[in-house]
């Protein structure tokens, strides 16, 4: 049994983490407000030209061209400018979908149409791909001569549900041939680069800002690119970069004014730019600029709380913190010690800071719902700490459920609603609190991905609370068998997520997109079993440089 004295974090063998390397750099980057104005004016001049393309009247071929244009707008990061037009086009086109797709024999066209309709909530049947299979149900080998078609089908396969068996076959077929294309090097360099990026992470699960940056580079190398669209995409991304740097400056200054850095042990993560980047993963559009700063503040708080639970808190101290959060009074600080006092003070400061904004908007329910979720989160962390220290041993299923809460799955999604105004009203918070199948699936996915990534380090640190560990013990299997089974679960969970995104009608589409974006966040953090949030080099550094430092040439 753990002693009721304060647990000493020095006794744990956790690796010391480096401090944020980016803060000084971004504070020094100048922002020219006049440049923002010039870019905005040119964007406003070009947008009507796209509107004209989207509003053109015609036959089924015209409808088909519009759907293909919508996918191009999505890939270039421009679709948010035309959401109403896109919604109307797809609703009209879906009513005559059989006429539009009936005689189409082009693999890329069908794959793109499938992706677009499903992305916007229209359940286009996967049977549209049967025209590309033989009597044995296998995809025709002649398709392998169409590199872009294979790539489009690979992308489409990631929108499959639990009953889209043909897409399972499509994924095997396309993965094999795309890897062969990479190895053979017969495609043009920009196509090979797109294939490599897509195999790392398909658009379905990638960050929208990353998709846009990569696809702009690809599209510029296409001989038949539309110069107007390319110019608009570049201007749009340049404007986003300027917005992002302004947000980072604001967030970094807020963090510096807190003056808490000297109070944290060296094991705690000063992930400042990373906390903002996690907010960018939830929404990239300029109208959510304030929301990203809010999300960054919450992400910083949640990172510190996670570190305190992993590295410092005794069960006794965390129990006292749980009681303070439930009472939610500054008076409770006096009952806490050292780090827990600073953590609770940070909680109060963040909620007070965010509260000033939402109260002025007449949306005080935001705070009530978020505080309730914070209560749930710290209680889940208490359970996890008890399990980690061997005080209690949960089942594999219980760990995945409670661990999904402790991973901040529900809190991260709910906190992203704050910067969305009336788009995410009270019903959005109530929906998350009801624990719908979609969000429970996302939470389980996050827990499994995190525990697969951290298994070796958790075990070497004596940290028992890990899904792989519990699966091995409960089902008497090896580490390798447990990991393979959990990876299979993640594949099935992704299909369930896709299914629930199509079936859920109780909340607005933008709220559903936040759920999808949380799934994307998980993929970005844990793809290839590489916890990039805790590694300042590698892929995370690449994202920061690509999105914020490398200028896009206009």
From Swiss-Prot:
A motif (DDXXD motif) lies at residues 306-310. It comes from Arabidopsis thaliana (Mouse-ear cress). This is (Z)-gamma-bisabolene synthase 1. Transmembrane segments: none annotated. It is an enzyme of class 4 (lyase). The gene is TPS12. Binds 3 Mg(2+) or Mn(2+) ions per subunit. The Asp-Asp-Xaa-Xaa-Asp/Glu (DDXXD/E) motif is important for the catalytic activity, presumably through binding to Mg(2+). Mg(2+) 1 binds at residues 306, 310. One of its GO terms (biological process) is response to wounding.
């Amino acid at each position: 049994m753990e002693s009721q004295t304060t647990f000493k974090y020095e006794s744990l063998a956790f690796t010391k983490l480096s401090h944020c390397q980016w803060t000084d750099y971004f504070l020094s980057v100048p922002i020219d407000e006049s440049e923002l104005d010039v870019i905005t004016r040119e964007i406003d001049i070009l947008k009507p030209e796209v509107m004209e393309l989207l509003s053109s009247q015609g036959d089924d071929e015209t409808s088909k061209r519009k759907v293909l244009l919508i996918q191009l707008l999505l890939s270039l990061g421009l679709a948010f400018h035309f959401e109403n037009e896109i919604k109307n086009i797809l609703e009209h086109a879906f009513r005559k979908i059989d006429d539009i797709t009936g005689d189409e024999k082009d693999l890329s066209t069908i794959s793109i149409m499938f992706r677009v309709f499903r992305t916007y909530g229209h359940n286009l049947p996967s049977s549209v791909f049967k025209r590309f299979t033989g009597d044995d149900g296998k995809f025709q080998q002649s398709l392998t001569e169409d590199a872009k078609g294979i790539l489009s089908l690979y992308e489409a396969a990631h929108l499959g549900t639990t009953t889209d068996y043909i897409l399972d076959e499509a994924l095997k077929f396309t993965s094999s041939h795309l890897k062969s294309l990479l190895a053979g090097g017969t495609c043009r360099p920009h196509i090979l680069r797109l294939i490599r990026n897509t195999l790392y992470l398909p658009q379905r699960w990638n960050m929208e800002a990353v998709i846009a940056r990569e696809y702009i580079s690809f599209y510029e190398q296409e001989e038949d690119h539309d110069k107007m669209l390319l110019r608009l995409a570049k201007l749009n991304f340049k404007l986003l970069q300027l917005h992002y740097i302004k947000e980072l400056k604001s967030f970094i200054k807020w963090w510096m004014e807190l003056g808490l850095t000297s109070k944290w042990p060296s094991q705690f993560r000063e992930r400042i730019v990373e906390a903002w980047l996690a907010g960018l993963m939830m929404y990239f559009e300029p109208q959510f600029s304030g929301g990203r700063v809010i999300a960054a503040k919450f992400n910083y708080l949640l990172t510190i709380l996670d570190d305190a639970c992993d590295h410092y808190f005794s069960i006794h101290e965390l129990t006292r913190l749980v009681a303070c959060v439930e009472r939610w009074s500054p008076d409770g600080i006096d009952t806490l010690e050292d780090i827990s006092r600073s953590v609770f003070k940070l909680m109060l400061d963040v909620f007070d800071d965010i509260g000033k904004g939402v109260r002025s908007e007449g949306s005080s329910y935001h705070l009530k719902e978020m505080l309730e979720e914070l209560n749930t989160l710290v209680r889940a962390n208490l359970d996890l700490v008890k399990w980690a220290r061997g005080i209690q041993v949960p089942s594999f299923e219980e760990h995945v459920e409670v661990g999904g809460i402790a991973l901040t799955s529900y809190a991260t999604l709910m906190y992203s609603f704050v910067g969305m105004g009336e788009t995410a009203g009270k019903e959005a918070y109530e929906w998350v609190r009801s624990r719908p199948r979609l969000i429970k699936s996302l939470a389980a996915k996050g827990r499994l991905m995190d525990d697969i990534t951290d298994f070796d380090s958790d075990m070497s640190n004596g940290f028992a609370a890990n899904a792989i560990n519990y699966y091995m013990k409960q089902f008497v299997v090896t580490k390798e068998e447990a990991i393979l089974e959990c990876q299979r679960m993640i594949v099935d969970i992704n299909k369930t997520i896709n299914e629930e995104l199509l079936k859920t009608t109780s909340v607005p589409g933008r709220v559903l997109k936040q759920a999808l974006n949380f799934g994307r966040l998980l993929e970005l953090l844990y793809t290839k079993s590489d916890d990039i949030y805790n590694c300042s080099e590698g892929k995370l550094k690449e994202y920061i440089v690509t999105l914020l430092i490398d200028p896009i040439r206009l």
